[in-house]
Amino acid sequence: MMSWAAASLRMTAVPCFRVRCLGFRVGPWGASQHANPGCGAAPHRTLHVSATASAGHNKWSKVRHIKGPKDMERSRIFSKLTLSIRLAVKEGGPNPENNSSLANILELCRSKNMPKSTIESALKTEKNKGIYLLYEGRGPGGSSLLIEALSNSGPKCHLDIKYILNKNGGMMAEGARHFFDKKGVVVVGVEDREKKAVNLERALELAIEAGAEDVKEAEDEEEKNLFKFICDASSLHQVRKKLDSLGLCPVSCSMEFIPHSKVQLAEPELEQAAHLIQALNNYEDVIHVYDNIE
């Protein structure tokens, strides 16, 4: 596992756009279409660098991704991408030229080598009648969970997720949303277009230039090294375009719930949390599970 570090670019200006409630409907794979046009880059930006424990010594990084056989893992990834396509089509239509959220998720599908036939099937509008749902939960050790789902039956999905939580040491719990901020996330490879390696120091410089608030080293499901550039929701596509112009290779561009307050768990609770999140991810209607475990 690669070493993990993070650097935050603290903005001196108050952000123009912030998601505060569960009722705000934003698809997870693109920026809101109602961003404040008056938002601009902060006139002054201070860089704060903070080192954290390396992923190789972080217990949660070791146990959170419980993988089955490679073919099953690949199928699970495609299943989640299919749900994301359906949600993007439901909220913005099937034409990626007019639906930036859909364009973003299709870009991610291509990077994962998702079969064209699978993508075309997910794009069919008659299949996109589900309801977008966001559940708040509490996991082992007082951890907070946000569970995104797309379901044709809201009541059934609610009961099923409640059952999975209760069976695996969790529970439905209001208030989990307050531990997360909705942010734009641009994921890029660790090599630029000229196949030159990009280190964290260089990524920080590019983050400042692109107007990002934070950059983190990360890994995808296949343990490939990546950088995640985190920015205000209203500037997601602007930051992506700038990073692309600076020579980086964006893999995806999406909206995510980023925890601003994390909890540390003892090893038995970490194992229990990993099994809970795996059980939730295995449920067919779940798109993504976010946690605030450190």
Swiss-Prot record:
Main location: mitochondrion
Family designation: Belongs to the TACO1 family.
InterPro entries hit by this protein: Integrase-like_N, TACO1_YebC-like_2nd/3rd_dom, TACO1_YebC_N, Transcrip_reg_TACO1-like, Transcrip_reg_TACO1-like_dom3, YebC-like
Name of the protein in question: Translational activator of cytochrome c oxidase 1
N6-acetyllysine found at: K162
Function: Acts as a translational activator of mitochondrially-encoded cytochrome c oxidase 1.
Organism: Mus musculus
An annotated Gene Ontology molecular function: mitochondrial ribosome binding
